[in-house]
Amino acid sequence: MYKRQQYPFDEQIRFEIRIDGRKVKTAEFPLRLRIPGWCEGATVAVNGQAVASPGKGSVAEERRAWRTGDVVTLRLPMEVAVSRWYERSAVVERGPLVYSLRIGEQWSKVRNPGKQIYGPWYYEVRPTTPWNYTLFEEDVRPERIAEAFRVERRDIGDAYPWTLENAPVEIRARGRRLDEWVLYQESAGPQPYSTNETANPAEEITLIPYGCTTLRITEFPLTRDLRKNW
């Protein structure tokens, strides 16, 4: 069985059946596919024909005599979701992945002036773009998420996906800088409590999968949009 996919970035996974051997043309066995708990509306198709619509958190089973060339397509629809964490912060998720702010990176090789137990030098990475953004309280409401967070997919071919440059999926959202959230001891300062108010204008920010980042903001404080009556 060969698996062709861009999962966990893409919703569709294709399984291609290959029966090895000159005499054996078919093989009967059950194919079991686990449906994640976050997924609503999963479908299973064999050779283009729908065979199952399993519920979330279940296991779909398709038993038959399989032949070389049979194709099983599992589709796992991915919707943007928001969960709440420390200090009422918001975390953006899509399917199995958590998303983080895309932050520009500057890498430097630094000589280690202390004991050489970890080697004579190390790499450090510092931000080249702003990072102290909030999301909007109004945008993370369930009825607003689909409109407020825009998913964009990129075709990266065979490139390694887990880098800042090659992230196959980006999520665009509104953000607003929070001036009082600053660096503390070379790291992002303590998490501000949501909800904050700031006069800074809204900006478009880009979120990418957590695993594509080295520097990251993942738990976003929230601020209100005082210009609108929601």
Where are these regions (language model features)?
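Non-cytosolic beta-sheet module surface loops
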Residues: 19-21, 34-37, 64
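C-terminal beta-strand-rich structural cap/linker in extracellular carbohydrate-active enzymes
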Residues: 30-32, 62-83
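Solvent-exposed, conformationally flexible loop/turn segments
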Residues: 26, 57, 67-69
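C-terminal beta-rich recognition modules with glycine/proline-rich loops and embedded aromatic residues
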Residues: 3-19, 23-25, 55, 75-230
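Residue-level preference for alpha-helix termini and adjacent loops
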Residues: 28, 37, 65, 96-98
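Solvent-exposed beta-strand/loop surfaces of large extracellular or lumenal domains
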Residues: 39-65, 82-87
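Beta-strand-rich binding/interaction modules
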Residues: 26-46
